[in-house]
């Protein structure tokens, strides 16, 4: 048997992955007598390429799928990609910009066609990269959030929620990105702590008796002020309530009103109210019937309502100009440094604007109630448990979800307006006739749905809903979702709500929330920071097994993972150690004819010890896999294979392997070596699927096993008859004695070949 001197992962990994695909090992066979184990991949963006976060996330999922597959249950891991509305449209719009064009130059239809062309040509590259990583998804079930089936699901859900009164359209203050020119949900806003200024501005009272001071971090919004509010119990301002002030520059008369929203002890105790550009001010405006004046356009450019001095300026240019003009008019008070959280677009990092706009919303509170109950009861388990409190806090304070986006790539809202009377009709297809006026011409709503609107249906839309399918009956609820805590609101909570609403089932039983991948300094890995390596380059240099093992080994359950080249060396060195042990073992056992039955073995202390340890390792490994403590499983397996099997048992067996005169002892050593090593490969296969498969097939030539592939081989079972604490203690004493002797020899520089007598007292 010819075995390469060094482990070369590239050819081996490709060979065995293609073998698994060819033989359909990743596609489950439904068995009504067995409960399946199902995992849904968090669909990566179609624009995405593999990064270290993907490596951790998908390796965690793959370890569990491979482990469960070996336990004999039907396993399903559904893959797919997300259409990623804003991100994907941005990619294609940048291409247009290189040609000196905008989306408006070519129109909606041509832009969408161009994005589909891009998707077919370059989108989904990450899927091929996940295959290189070794992900054992059922690729026959791959989905796309805008494929025909999922589009049908989206329309059906929108229509049903609208019929239930849970989807509505209305003017509300929303988060607006002037760069992406679209609304954003609250959870799509990244809040960053920044040090800015709190500007105190003096508004003159109309009667000329003085002025009132208001403070703001956004002076440009003063141009849309329609009131100044004070607390009704604030004695300082009671006499001013009902009076008016003149808004500087605009000269608009605005009232001084009383509202309990105002904090008496913050700043001057007077608050400027801008109903069209602040969510809290909007609520105050509703209570006091204030005018809502929009002072900037969708690009963040000041409009005619801002006044001639400021019209045409960007919002930040306007801010500077206002400060300059207030100083000139002696209306600028104290400027105080102020630390506050500033919202940024999660896609382009632009500072978002609070903006009054006509949008579509989902009422979330009615659906949140059951989603709270299933987590409180433990029906859906969030692990680690510390995330339960975070989840419940958000759900118990949930707000309506703005689902409309002012872009062209995505699921277009299935709502139509009669061209004659404006009647709104929500339907899957263009209506034939208006029920109100009989007109036959309609215009579809221009907006598309938030990307997450298709994603929250992922657990059941991927299984064929709204059709009644066997997959839905058999595989839902799924067993495990592995994701990052950053999308616990955006995705996890919404999937629970949607699946309960439309399936009357939970979407998954367990959610494993893992940490971030950080560099050696503790910084989050990011390509923009230049501290994130390309995982494909790592796979090409180290092999997928080494990368997978290193990430699992180094990531405690639910904790952040610290990445460095030295971490990668752990996986590579372990793979090399396994390979060298395999090569040495096979070079020697192939020279020994025959193989005894297990009941014919002449077991010595070392044999009994390694079997005792092996069965304890089987117990602990299975326990850790079941409890999702995958790094503990990796640590246990490396310790056993490297330190106990290679460093001790393999060395102790050499005398018998080389001793052809003791045939019985030689055959026993051969059997135990092959048996323990093939069992170890079974235990390690979920984490390192390729090197274990190669070695397992090599062992199979000398040690018959019934399975055709390690991917579908049986996971080892504990044999308690072999676990023996006395043998473990006896062997520990021998190991300690040998270690002491080796240390003494080294201290006196005694050559290894020199024999000495040992006296033990």
Positions of PLM-derived features:
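Alpha-helical recognition segments enriched in aromatics with Gly/Pro capping
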Residues: 260, 288-300, 407-410, 414-420, ...
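Secondary-structure capping and boundary motifs in well-ordered enzyme cores
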Residues: 31-41, 53-56, 60, 80, ...
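N-terminal catalytic cores of NTP/NDP-binding nucleotidyl/phosphoryl-transfer enzymes
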Residues: 31-92, 145, 154, 214-217, ...
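Non-catalytic terminal extensions that flank enzyme cores
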Residues: 1-52, 69, 75, 346, ...
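Structural preference for alpha-helix termini/caps and helix-kink/transition segments
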Residues: 545-589, 667-685, 746-753
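Residue patterns forming the tRNA-binding/recognition surfaces of aminoacyl-tRNA synthetases
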Residues: 15, 19-23, 93-211, 222, ...
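Acidic, turn-prone loop/beta-hairpin segments
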Residues: 82, 178, 185-190, 432, ...
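Polar, glycine-rich mid-to-C-terminal structural blocks
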Residues: 199-203, 730-753
């Amino acid at each position: 048997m010819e075995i390469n001197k060094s482990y070369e992962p590239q050819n081996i990994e490709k060979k065995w992955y293609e073998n698994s695909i060819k033989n359909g090992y990743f596609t489950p066979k439904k068995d009504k007598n067995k409960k399946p184990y199902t995992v849904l991949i968090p669909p990566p963006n179609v624009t995405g390429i593999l990064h270290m976060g993907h490596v951790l996330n998908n390796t965690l999922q793959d370890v569990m799928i491979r482990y469960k597959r070996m336990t004999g249950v039907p396993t399903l891991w559904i893959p797919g990609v997300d259409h990623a509305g804003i991100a994907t449209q941005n990619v294609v719009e940048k291409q247009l910009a290189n040609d000196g064009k905008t989306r408006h130059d070519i129109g909606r239809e041509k832009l969408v066609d161009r994005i589909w062309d891009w998707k077919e040509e370059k989108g989904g590259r990450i899927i091929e990269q996940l295959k290189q990583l070794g992900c054992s998804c059922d690729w026959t079930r791959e989905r796309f959030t805008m494929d025909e089936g999922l589009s049908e699901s989206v329309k059906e859900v929108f229509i049903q929620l609208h019929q239930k009164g849970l989807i509505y359209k209305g003017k509300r203050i929303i988060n607006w990105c002037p760069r992406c020119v679209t609304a954003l949900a609250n959870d799509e806003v990244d809040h960053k702590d920044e040090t800015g200024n709190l500007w105190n501005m003096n508004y003159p009272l109309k009667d000329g008796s003085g002025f009132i001071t208001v403070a703001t971090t956004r002076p440009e919004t003063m141009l849309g002020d329609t009131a100044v509010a004070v607390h009704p119990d604030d004695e300082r301002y009671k006499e001013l309530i009902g009076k008016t002030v003149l808004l500087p520059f605009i000269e608009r008369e605005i009232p001084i009103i009383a509202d309990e929203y105002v904090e008496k002890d913050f700043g001057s105790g007077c608050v400027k109210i801008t109903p069209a550009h602040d969510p809290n001010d909007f609520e105050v405006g509703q209570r006091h019937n204030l005018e809502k004046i929009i002072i900037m356009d969708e690009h963040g450019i000041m409009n005619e309502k801002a006044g001639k001095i400021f019209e045409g300026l960007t919002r930040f240019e306007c801010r500077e100009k206002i400060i300059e003009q207030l100083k000139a008019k002696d209306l600028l008070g104290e400027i105080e440094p102020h630390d506050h959280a500033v919202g940024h677009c999660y896609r382009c990092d632009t500072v978002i604007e609070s903006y009054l706009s006509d949008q579509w919303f989902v009422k979330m509170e009615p659906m949140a109630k059951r989603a709270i109950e299933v987590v409180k009861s433990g029906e859906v388990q969030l692990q680690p448990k510390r995330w339960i409190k975070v989840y419940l806090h958000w759900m118990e304070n949930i707000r309506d979800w703005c689902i409309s986006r002012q872009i062209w790539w995505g699921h277009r809202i299935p709502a139509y307006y009669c061209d004659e009377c404006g009647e709104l009709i929500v339907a899957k297809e263009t209506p034939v006739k208006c029920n109100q006026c009989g007109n036959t011409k309609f215009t579809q709503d221009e907006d598309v749905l938030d990307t997450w609107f298709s994603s929250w249906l992922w657990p059941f839309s991927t299984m064929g809903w709204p059709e009644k399918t066997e997959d839905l009956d058999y595989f839902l609820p799924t067993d495990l979702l592995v994701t990052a805590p950053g999308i616990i609101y955006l995705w996890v909570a919404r999937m629970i709500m949607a699946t309960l609403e439309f399936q009357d089932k939970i979407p998954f039983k367990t959610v494993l929330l893992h940490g971030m991948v950080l560099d050696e300094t503790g910084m989050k890995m990011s390509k923009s920071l230049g501290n994130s390596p390309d995982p494909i380059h790592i796979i090409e240099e180290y092999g997928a097994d080494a990368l997978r093992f290193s990430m699992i080994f180094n990531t405690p359950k639910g904790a952040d993972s610290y990445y460095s080249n030295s971490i990668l060396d752990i996986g590579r060195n372990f793979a090399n150690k396994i390979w060298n042990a395999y090569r040495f073992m096979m070079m020697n056992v192939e020279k020994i004819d025959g193989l005894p039955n297990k009941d014919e073995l002449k077991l010595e202390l070392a044999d009994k010890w390694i079997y005792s340890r092996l069965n304890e390792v089987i117990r602990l490994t299975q326990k850790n896999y079941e409890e999702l403590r995958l790094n503990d499983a990796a640590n246990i397996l490396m310790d056993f294979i490297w330190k106990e099997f290679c460093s001790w048992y393999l060395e102790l067996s050499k005398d018998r392997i080389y001793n052809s005169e003791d045939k019985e002892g030689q055959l026993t050593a051969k059997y135990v070596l092959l048996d323990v090593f093939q069992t170890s490969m079974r235990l390690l296969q979920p984490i390192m699927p390729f090197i274990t498969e190669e070695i397992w097939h090599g062992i199979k030539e000398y040690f018959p096993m019934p399975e055709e592939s390690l991917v579908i081989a049986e996971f080892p079972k504990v044999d308690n008859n072999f676990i023996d604490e006395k043998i473990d203690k006896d062997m520990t004493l021998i190991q300690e004695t040998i270690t002491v002797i080796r240390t003494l020899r080294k201290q006196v520089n005694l050559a290894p070949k020199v024999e000495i007598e040992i006296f033990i007292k």
